[in-house]
Amino acid sequence: MRDALNTGLIDFLKASPTPFHATASLAQRLEAAGYQRLDERDSWATVPGGRYYVTRNDSSIIAIKLGKQAPLLNGIRMVGAHTDSPCLRVKPQPELQRQGFLQLGVEVYGGALLAPWFDRDLSLAGRVTYRRDGKVESQLIDFKLPIAIIPNLAIHLNRTANEGWAINPQNELPPILAQVAGDERIDFRALLTEQLAREHELIADVVLDYELSFYDTQDAALIGLHGDFIAGARLDNLLSCYAGLQALLAADSDETCVLVCNDHEEVGSCSACGADGPMLEQTLQRLLPDGDSYVRTVQRSLMVSADNAHGVHPNYADKHDGNHGPKLNAGPVIKVNNNQRYATNSETAGFFRHLCMAEEVPVQSFVVRSDMGCGSTIGPITASHLGVRTVDIGLPTFAMHSIRELCGSHDLAHLVKVLTAFYRSRELP
């Protein structure tokens, strides 16, 4: 099971260079398992035991496995994650031609570690909107090949490089794509028109707009002397999306189960398809007959917010509280913050710990050092919007928000096992 899950995760990461591609990959896997797509613009005719999914903005997805009994009786088991990761996104008018090189201006998306983006073989993917035969359409593209790089400045020209330096995103991050003649002018949108023709065999009249991200072309891989680790891009938080999907597909539950994977978590979740928007609430309201049933059902439900946790790094162990240093390959982490940066409380933490003990899955705890600030997740946002009880958990990770992150190769199986048990649980606290 562990090897198959790890291989599946690596394949999923490769197919998901952007939130758009991640959502499409999740939808493809759901459809292969018999899930039916629901269109938010249509009326829904769902049936007990039915399997459905809905997307918004092509970058967020909610999968629903309706129970044979009404959700009002035993509540809904929900797992939440997010599809986005920090990256470099192309600006609307990006062409830069400097010193005979074609470069693209980029904007930093989210709280990225910037130094690891240098000297990497980069490709470009995302969503393109165009006009064809008088109609406005959109399509996903992925160049796949390494078409760009951000070369470092040689240490001979920057003698203090190893003493730390502040990276200027405006000046130092535009990737180089090609050499060009002095009088040659490159139209980036024309390049996108060519890519649409290559990848999808369609001829666009004009590219109207796009949302494109650079990404590292190096595939995720099992690494380490004994294969103890998985190294790859976007583990935060496609790792949790994949674990939630596998648990949902494996759970033969009579209860109603939901997996929600939101976009825009890395930039605050405040969007129509983010956790701070109405997507999940509106979806649940459409599944329940009236307002009274909705409130009662939510109060009988529970959300597991799954997002990567900071593993204790052997070179920087002092960055953790001495009693709360999550270790890689030692199981999922319950995340606690009394200032509500995480939504965990004693009841939800106790229930998750109970599930882990019942499944013989190791479990850990994390609380940030008292002299450091704490990050957050979709957990508190979802809890405050729905009023649903929530526990924040995640798998220990190194180099979070780097272009290449690291997690334990045993932990995915641990997380899938306990999330499957959660979906199967007959009673919630």
From Swiss-Prot:
- Gene Ontology biological process terms from the UniProt entry: proteolysis
Question: What sections of the protein cross the membrane?
Answer: none
The molecular function GO annotations come to: aminopeptidase activity; metallopeptidase activity; zinc ion binding
UniProt KW keywords = Aminopeptidase, Hydrolase, Metal-binding, Metalloprotease, Protease, Zinc
Kindly give the InterPro entries that the UniProt entry links to this protein: M18_aminopeptidase_2 (IPR022984), Peptidase_M18 (IPR001948), Peptidase_M18_dom2 (IPR023358)
Q: Which residues bind Zn(2+)?
A: H82, H156, H401
GO-annotated cellular components = cytoplasm
Major enzyme class: hydrolase
Highest taxon listed in the record's lineage: Bacteria
> Which Enzyme Commission number(s) are on file for it?
3.4.11.-
Names of the cofactor(s): Zn(2+)
Pfam families associated with the record: Peptidase_M18
- Please give the family membership noted in the entry: Belongs to the peptidase M18 family.
Query: In its UniProt entry, what is this protein called?
Result: Probable M18 family aminopeptidase 2
Starting at the broadest rank, the lineage of the source organism is: Bacteria, Pseudomonadati, Pseudomonadota, Gammaproteobacteria, Pseudomonadales
